[in-house]
Amino acid sequence: MNPDNDNDSLPLLTLPEQLFLLILNPETGKLPYTFVPLFHGFVGCGIAELQLMDKVIVTKQNSQSFNNNKMLIKVIDHSKTGDTFLDYILSKLSNSFAQKGLQMATAILTISVGLNKMKRITETIAQSLIKKGFIRGTLKRSVLFKNKSIYEVIDYQAKLSVESSICKVLSTPPDYPDNCLRELIILLTFKQYEDFLIKPKLMDSLISRLYHPEQCAHIKANLRLINKNFYKEPSEVHLTNDPSVKMLSLVIGGIRNAITSE
């Protein structure tokens, strides 16, 4: 094993890749169109993955600060993960500007802008999924003569697996987040785009596809319960003693703040 590449702990599908598969429309091969960039959610999930890999931690800002409840993201392990997208995020969080720590929304916005200029975030994640054999990518020329990427799902089992894990959480909301933390991160990230989609409503579309019509109202109520139980507003995060709830709240709050800042 390369000591500079700690990919033994890298999951088969990273959180950004799971989010990509979840929102990819298998019929059109397209990602949904939103008023705001999808990549804020991808970056937020990437930071969450690095937290789960113990590459980054969340620390409280210096107590001498005016607002000592402010939480910052800091890198504690600079070794590469073996994933191009995660390694880019890690490098941005490791630079001199970010060494003292960044608030989650600031980190997401900083990384989104940087990678968007270098290479489109969605294409970076797609290339990883292509290499792993989950999707196939093609370029389609639009009416404006601009090439646009279209993705064909090759491994439907992988997409179904992501959907099934989300379905399980929605069907039976957990009392504690620890055993389904990855699913909750994906689900609550997914939910942040509800207010910013043109059509169809992404969450409504997913629920309608996974459940019988008579179940949909109950499942939507479960989603509201999950959001209430495991997402705390920024002003309340420091009041919880549950590290998983704290992590979820900081990640999802950062994604939402990045989205609404657009």
Curated annotation (Swiss-Prot):
<dbReference type="InterPro" id="IPR038261">
    <property type="entry name" value="GPP34-like_sf"/>
</dbReference>
<keyword id="KW-0813">Transport</keyword>
<protein>
    <recommendedName>
        <fullName>VPS74-like protein DDB_G0288371</fullName>
    </recommendedName>
</protein>
<keyword id="KW-0446">Lipid-binding</keyword>
<keyword id="KW-0333">Golgi apparatus</keyword>
<comment type="similarity">
    <text>Belongs to the GOLPH3/VPS74 family.</text>
</comment>
<dbReference type="GO" id="GO:0032580">
    <property type="term" value="C:Golgi cisterna membrane"/>
</dbReference>
<keyword id="KW-0472">Membrane</keyword>
<dbReference type="InterPro" id="IPR008628">
    <property type="entry name" value="GPP34-like"/>
</dbReference>
<keyword id="KW-0653">Protein transport</keyword>
<dbReference type="GO" id="GO:0015031">
    <property type="term" value="P:protein transport"/>
</dbReference>
<dbReference type="Pfam" id="PF05719">
    <property type="entry name" value="GPP34"/>
</dbReference>
<dbReference type="GO" id="GO:0070273">
    <property type="term" value="F:phosphatidylinositol-4-phosphate binding"/>
</dbReference>
<comment type="function">
    <text>Phosphatidylinositol-4-phosphate-binding protein that links Golgi membranes to the cytoskeleton and may participate in the tensile force required for vesicle budding from the Golgi. Thereby, may play a role in Golgi membrane trafficking. May also bind to the coatomer to regulate Golgi membrane trafficking. May play a role in anterograde transport from the Golgi to the plasma membrane and regulate secretion. May be involved in vacuolar protein sorting.</text>
</comment>
